[in-house]
């Protein structure tokens, strides 16, 4: 008996971007839903967001065409960045010297999983909770003194 396939991948190779800079963005979207991932990538100010968002769109289109899954049920289950080839050039400098220039590339793989097809989703994967929510935060009013009077700077 074959197991039903619930995960689809999209791969992009030789992106002219450092692997460390791409990992900074990939770490933020791993484990999140498809719609939340697109919102995060739209609002992040990094250059790596554009090729990663195209890759997320491609993975969702692959899931839609291969499995017929709805985009609302997709979760980024696997996201990895590997180093690619490095192009080496030389920049001519004064007095016949030269400095090496390394143009680094990377390979990015995005895997999306359809949670409606997976029975064990609740046990294995859970959506990331926002880090900024803390149940112990309290509001501090700076314009009220310890007795409760309103403090005016005038």
Swiss-Prot record:
SUPFAM superfamilies, A to Z: Ribosomal protein L22
Stretches that traverse the bilayer: none
Any GO BP annotation: translation
Localization per record: Plastid, Chloroplast
GO MF annotation: an example: structural constituent of ribosome
UniProt key word Repressor: no
Pfam families registered for this protein in UniProt: Ribosomal_L22
InterPro entries listed in its UniProt record: Ribosomal_uL22, Ribosomal_uL22_bac/chlpt-type, Ribosomal_uL22_bac/org-type, Ribosomal_uL22_sf
Nuclease listed as a keyword: no
GO cellular component, one term: chloroplast
Gene3D superfamilies the record matches: Ribosomal protein L22/L17
Annotated keywords: Chloroplast, Plastid, Ribonucleoprotein, Ribosomal protein, RNA-binding, rRNA-binding
Family: Belongs to the universal ribosomal protein uL22 family.
HAMAP family recorded: Ribosomal_uL22_B
PANTHER family, A to Z: CHLOROPLAST 50S RIBOSOMAL PROTEIN L22-RELATED, LARGE RIBOSOMAL SUBUNIT PROTEIN UL22M
Function: This protein binds specifically to 23S rRNA.
Quaternary data: Part of the 50S ribosomal subunit.
UniProt-recorded name of the protein: Large ribosomal subunit protein uL22c
Source species of the chain: Jasminum nudiflorum (Winter jasmine)
UniProt gene name: rpl22
């Amino acid at each position: 008996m074959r197991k039903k396939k619930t995960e689809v991948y999209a791969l992009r190779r030789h992106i002219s971007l450092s692997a460390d800079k791409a990992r900074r963005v990939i770490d933020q979207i791993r484990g999140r839903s498809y719609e939340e991932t697109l919102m995060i990538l739209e609002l992040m100010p990094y250059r790596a967001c554009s090729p990663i968002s195209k890759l997320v769109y491609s993975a969702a289109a692959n899931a839609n065409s291969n499995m017929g899954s709805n985009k609302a049920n997709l979760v980024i289950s696997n996201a990895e960045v590997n180093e690619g080839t490095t192009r080496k050039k030389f920049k001519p400098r004064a007095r016949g010297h030269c400095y090496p220039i390394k143009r680094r590339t990377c390979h990015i793989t995005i895997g999306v999983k359809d949670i409606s097809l997976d029975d064990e989703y609740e046990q294995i994967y859970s959506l990331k909770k926002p880090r900024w929510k803390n149940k112990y935060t309290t509001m501090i009013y700076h314009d009220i003194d310890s007795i409760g009077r309103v403090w005016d700077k005038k």
